[in-house]
Amino acid sequence: MSRITFDTLLEAGAHFGHLKRKWNPAMAPYIFMERNGIHIIDLHKTAAMTETAAEALKQIAKSGKKILFVSTKKQLKEIVAEKALSVGMPYVIERWPGGMLTNFPTIRKAVKKMATIDKLTQDGTYSNLSKREVLQISRQRAKLDKNLGSIADLTRLPSAIFVVDVMKEHIAVHEANRLGIPVFAIVDTNSNPNDIDFVIPANDDATKSVEVILDACCAAIAEGIEERKVEKVDTEAAEGEENEAKKAPRRRTTKARAAKAEEAPIAE
């Protein structure tokens, strides 16, 4: 698993927290010092906690489950989407749909509506509609795709969510907490870490800071997915050998043949 180092985090500016007056006292255990009115995060703890989170994410991925990435910050949308896509995980980078987790069946209906609209374009139904109706449906499809397209493959609730900036994504965190879904998060000095299962204390505003942490976590997820594939191949191979062994005719032992000969009637 790719390890994240103190130097990597330092170069990325992951140690810069917020102004002292904006801090959340619950983040005190993760703060190293104050400099020029700004809190400095303890990167030794950041590195260690990133490793812990990465290992947990690896195990989730290895079990074949999904992790939902969440970040609606403008400067972080692209990087979060890129990293989530690299490991085949769903993500939300537009406005968080209220009830995304707590009212998941309704969200799934909206996703299925996209598939229904796509079917209309394929079976020729569009040709029977007016231009105005086609335009309305096309706009509806575009809106659904923008907000929900990135979770189209999420057929059931995720097994965990990974959040960047727990203050901005507080609704997502709250919904996950209500359902008992583990929350992994990059938490800055102005945020409350108490509702987070796997805290990664770091600068959640700087693109580079978020990127290096996501790199480490996604590398672990990729390893988990690969290990699952290898185990599946090994299991299938073992099952195949077992089935072949069952099909093969059993050779009778010498004792069994002798016993059968003794039972045979002697010709007079």
Task: For every predicted segment, state its role.
Residues 1-232:
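Ribosome large-subunit tunnel/peptidyl-transferase-proximal elements
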Residues 1-3, 223-268:
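Intrinsically disordered, compositionally biased charged tails
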